């Protein structure tokens, strides 16, 4: 049984979406809450199972704060690590020796991909895109458009939200 066979068995048993790219490459689609989907590209080589998930594009601002967050987060991770490509886009990566691959290991690995991608996403948005988010919020409010996909950031983006919080605490 190959490492990808074990991955496919895990995906089937866990009711997780998986797409076959070719005999040595599949993509696992993990459902999240903050980051709605995390697609993990899984490639089997002679020696390892190489996994990579796109997390977020290159930040628009606060590059040092953004990068520092990623490096500090790497200290907490056991199987995965954040990486940045030549464009500055952020990925989560892991390489597992083929002989170490079991369903249990795949479960823990995919769990870490999901947990880290989901728990880091909003923090990375705020650190790297706050100016754009504020402009988007103002534009939507001024036109009566929905702010539903920005609701998680209301306290940061809506100046009126902070005023009403102050009045409530008095």
Report the location of each language-model feature.
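Short, highly charged C-terminal tails/helix-capping segments
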Residues: 125-170
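N-terminal catalytic cores of peptidoglycan-degrading enzymes
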Residues: 1-61
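Short amphipathic alpha-helical segments
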Residues: 2-6, 58-66, 105, 109-112, ...
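Short, internal acidic amphipathic alpha-helical interface segments
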Residues: 52-93
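A contiguous, mid-protein "functional segment" used to position or interact
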Residues: 100-139
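A generic structural motif
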Residues: 55-59, 96-105
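Conserved short hydrophobic interaction patches
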Residues: 10-13, 69-77, 109-123
């Amino acid at each position: 049984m190959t490492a990808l066979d074990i991955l496919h068995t895990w995906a089937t048993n866990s009711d997780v979406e998986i797409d076959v790219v070719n005999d040595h490459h599949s993509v696992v689609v993990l459902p999240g809450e903050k980051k709605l989907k995390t697609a993990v590209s899984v490639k089997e080589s002679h020696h390892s199972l190489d996994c990579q998930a796109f997390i977020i594009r290159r930040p628009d601002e606060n590059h040092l704060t953004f990068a520092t967050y990623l490096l500090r987060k790497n200290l907490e991770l056991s199987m995965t690590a954040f990486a940045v490509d030549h464009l500055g886009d952020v990925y989560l990566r892991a390489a597992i020796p083929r002989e170490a691959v079991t369903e249990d290991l795949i479960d823990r690995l995919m769990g870490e991909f999901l947990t880290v991608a989901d728990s880091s996403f909003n923090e990375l948005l705020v650190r790297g895109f706050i100016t754009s988010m504020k402009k988007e919020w103002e534009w939507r409010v001024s036109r009566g458009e929905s702010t539903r996909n920005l609701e998680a950031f209301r306290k940061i983006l809506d100046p009126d939200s902070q005023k009403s919080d102050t009045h409530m605490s008095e």
